[in-house]
């Protein structure tokens, strides 16, 4: 079992943790999140980005992690970036707690997300269905108020 965590923080009040667990290279990864301080009653995009670099804040993380050269999509789509995690839903206080399993996100192997950045976005991910070029790259999820590098957890 490999476990990893991204401690989420940034230039906003958004913070929290996103954890990853994978039993072996052939099993889905469980992704769990506990995010606070976001917009109330909203769906907000979150993605694994290419680089584990936060030198200039979350913008240094680069584009979505996309080792297979696909266009942006929903987590359940065949055509999607590895880093496309979709949206989480916040409650009336702007907090979100949840989990999902993902067959493309890996902690083990050549396409591992370890050392890359988990970015929480300011907007809703349109899952590549926005009808414009930016939708096929980013899901029009907007600015990056908070992020954290995915590191090995105890």
UniProtKB/Swiss-Prot annotation:
InterPro entries for the chain: SOD-like_Cu/Zn_dom_sf, SOD_Cu/Zn_/chaperone, SOD_Cu/Zn_BS, SOD_Cu_Zn_dom
pH behavior: Retains over 90% of its activity between pH 5.6 and 7.0. Retains 85% of its activity at pH 4.0 and 60% of its activity at pH 12.0.
Binding site for Cu cation: 47, 49, 64, 121
Primary localization: cytoplasm
S-S bridge residues: 58-147
Cofactor binding mode and count: Binds 1 copper ion per subunit.
Name used for this protein in its record: Superoxide dismutase [Cu-Zn]
Species the sequence originates in: Aspergillus niger
Encoding gene (name): sodC
